[in-house]
Amino acid sequence: MDPALAAQMSEAVAEKMLQYRRDTAGWKICREGNGVSVSWRPSVEFPGNLYRGEGIVYGTLEEVWDCVKPAVGGLRVKWDENVTGFEIIQSITDTLCVSRTSTPSAAMKLISPRDFVDLVLVKRYEDGTISSNATHVEHPLCPPKPGFVRGFNHPCGCFCEPLPGEPTKTNLVTFFHTDLSGYLPQNVVDSFFPRSMTRFYANLQKAVKQFHE
């Protein structure tokens, strides 16, 4: 992928993510519990929903980021039940790459294994926040593979945010914005994401404790 185009695209995605983070209008809460709130609103990118999760994770910002960051051989594959593989298709800079993520079957196998090819940008902000910003791209080195339905991530990612005065806690805001593709009943998709995101936070908390205590 052309590096200049990749840089331009990824910065636009990061800006869109900041807009999602700042925009408080139009979100409808669909699941709450154990300190985690999941809400949604209709996507303007595809005929589906944009989901937003927020919760406090007990761990320093760097510990939490270490568990969620997009990295080959990283911890995410070890604890996230919705990730079975992560590989770098093209490394563009030390903070920008094209990746392929594979996911298992889900919802009692109503959702078959998926894979996603994304342009991913990691950004650090002056207040200490670290963000991961991603969107789907096509790449000649990663055509569709047998055994996987190719899904499409629209602008999505997460913000690991420091909590002033509480260095051992991190506010994690996540945005899931996924077209799972294939012929899935909408009610299956609508029930999958809120439940899956709630488990994501619970499993992440266990991972931070397991890998960083």
Swiss-Prot record:
An example Gene Ontology molecular-function term: cholesterol transfer activity
Highest taxon listed in the record's lineage: Eukaryota
Alphabetized SUPFAM superfamilies for the sequence: Bet v1-like
Pfam families attached to this UniProt entry: START
Domain START, residue spans: 1-213
GO biological process: cholesterol import
InterPro entries reported in the protein's UniProt record: StARD5/6, START-like_dom_sf, START_lipid-bd_dom
UniProt keywords, alphabetically: Lipid transport, Lipid-binding, Transport
Role this protein plays: May be involved in the intracellular transport of sterols or other lipids. May bind cholesterol or other sterols.
The protein's name: StAR-related lipid transfer protein 5
Species of origin: Homo sapiens (Human)
